[in-house]
Amino acid sequence: MYWVNGQRRNEVPIHDRSFQYGDGCFTTILTKEGQVQQWSSHKARLQACLDILHIPEPNWDRVWQGLQSMILPQEKAGLKIHISRGLGGRGYSPTQVSESIVTISAFAFPAHYQAWRDKGLAVGICQQRMGLNPLLAGHKHNNRLEQILLKREMDNAGWDDGVCLDINGKVIETTAANIFWCRDGTMFTPCLRHAGVAGVARRQILELAQQQEIPIVIDEFTLEDLLSAEEVFITNALLEVAPVTQIGQQRLTIGSMTRRFQESSNS
């Protein structure tokens, strides 16, 4: 059952432009004990993507009510907000499109995430490369084919996740998370000017680092930069913060900075 523009439905229309063209955006939200986490940040990110796609904003009060009605009664669970430009229009042209369509769905918290948070992940290095798209970089739009192909590659190779590089060999993210690493008391993360998704959890970590006066460098980095790290962790809204204990053949220890941010982001 889905929440669709204020109504409960079991299906979505085939003429929805998100189904036809991936014309929209989405976000995935963590709930804890029935409470929506980081809503203001999720809303801001959705609005930024809607603005770049020229999709009218929905009634956010109604969306909030929809979220509340869909929360699963579990210690941890997830909600997905999917916003489509709407129905209709001939071909790619959006000039004859109806109002935007907001769909909310609920799902159980991934069972393996807690083990990843506690013990860490082993990640590979994706051989396929991400393209450059500065117009849409940072936004979580509904076209995720690159991530699907990269995740398929890592699944077939037996890794938990994979480090994604762009066509110029710069580190961008993993297939499902943003990536941070630490060396000599300084934290590093890719800038995402040309590719990747700027996650809500990434934003939270950047804010926490600033509050705690931890030096952080946001720039373009090579794989060699990443492999010189003393500790590495990844973030997304559901997983929050999880340590990386292996990148390819290189082993890593779980560092104090990682545990510090796990504690800070969970408070």
From Swiss-Prot:
Belongs to the class-IV pyridoxal-phosphate-dependent aminotransferase family. One of its GO terms (cellular component) is cytosol. It comes from the Bacteria. It comes from Vibrio cholerae serotype O1 (strain ATCC 39315 / El Tor Inaba N16961). GO terms for biological process: 4-aminobenzoate biosynthetic process; folic acid biosynthetic process; tetrahydrofolate biosynthetic process. Homodimer. Its cofactor is pyridoxal 5'-phosphate. Pathway: Cofactor biosynthesis; tetrahydrofolate biosynthesis; 4-aminobenzoate from chorismate: step 2/2. InterPro entries: Aminodeoxychorismate_lyase_IV, Aminotrans_IV, Aminotrans_IV_CS, Aminotransferase-like, BCAT-like_C, BCAT-like_N, Class-IV_PLP-Dep_Aminotrnsfr. This is Aminodeoxychorismate lyase. The keyword Lyase applies. GO terms for molecular function: 4-amino-4-deoxychorismate lyase activity; pyridoxal phosphate binding. Keywords: Folate biosynthesis, Lyase, Pyridoxal phosphate. It holds the Pfam family Aminotran_4. Its EC number is 4.1.3.38. The modification N6-(pyridoxal phosphate)lysine is found at K140. The keyword Lyase applies.
